[in-house]
């Protein structure tokens, strides 16, 4: 499994941040990550909040379980 780690950059990180930003407007417990394309501290905090909401380990990294939860939430709430 591929994991998005702190400092990673690129289109996939941008997409993750975009989806988290959309969710942050609907759920006050998910902070906006800012959409920069770099998995920085604010992005990690947003991922950790999503992980908490889905009862996943809160590490701020995006693995398959976190990705699947993000996609599910985004599809339901976009």
What are the roles of these predicted feature ranges?
Residues 1-78:
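Cell-envelope/ECM-targeting effectors and their regulatory/trafficking segments
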């Amino acid at each position: 499994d591929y994991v998005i780690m702190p400092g990673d950059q690129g289109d996939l990180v941008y997409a993750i941040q975009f989806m988290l930003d959309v969710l942050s407007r609907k759920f006050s417990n998910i902070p906006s990550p800012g959409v920069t394309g770099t998995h920085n501290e604010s992005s990690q905090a947003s991922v950790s909040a999503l992980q908490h909401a889905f009862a996943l380990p809160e590490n701020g990294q995006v693995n398959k379980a976190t990705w699947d939860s993000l996609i599910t939430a985004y599809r339901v709430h976009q």
